[in-house]
Amino acid sequence: MRTRNDPNRPAQPDLLSAVLRSQLTELNLPFIRDHSHSVAQTAAEKQWSHLDYLTELVAGEAAARTDRRVQRRIKDARFPVLKTLDAFDWNWPTKINRLQVQNLFHLDFVAQHANVVFISGTGLGKSHLMTALGHAACLRGHSVLFTGAIDIINTLAAAQAAG
């Protein structure tokens, strides 16, 4: 390995690694920074081409960024507890329209700029279903805010009072 300044002098691997790590940090490429060595070892063992090695690193970086975006959306949504549709007990309440609820998870209402409101008595699973629906939306790249009607009314009243 040669340095850029003096092509006849070997580069110092530790210094080169430190410079590369610093540049990858500056470029905000943490996956590549943290995994380039292990992926390089795998590439050498499996005799990957340079393009295969680069493709693996970039794919890993892209996947890591997607995961971080999803986690940020979930955090920003302020779900009280994370719930999924799979965990919902369809045996109670007995009069719920399962197909109608499951169709909401296609998220067609988002593209139509429509709202979804669940109205029922206490303890019938409204919060569970809305949390699961919001979670599904976060996974598909949508921003969500989980809040109750009282909080919305209080926020609107405070905004109106502030002018």
What is each residue range found by the language model?
Residues 1-31:
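Charged, compositionally biased N-terminal leader segments and the immediate start
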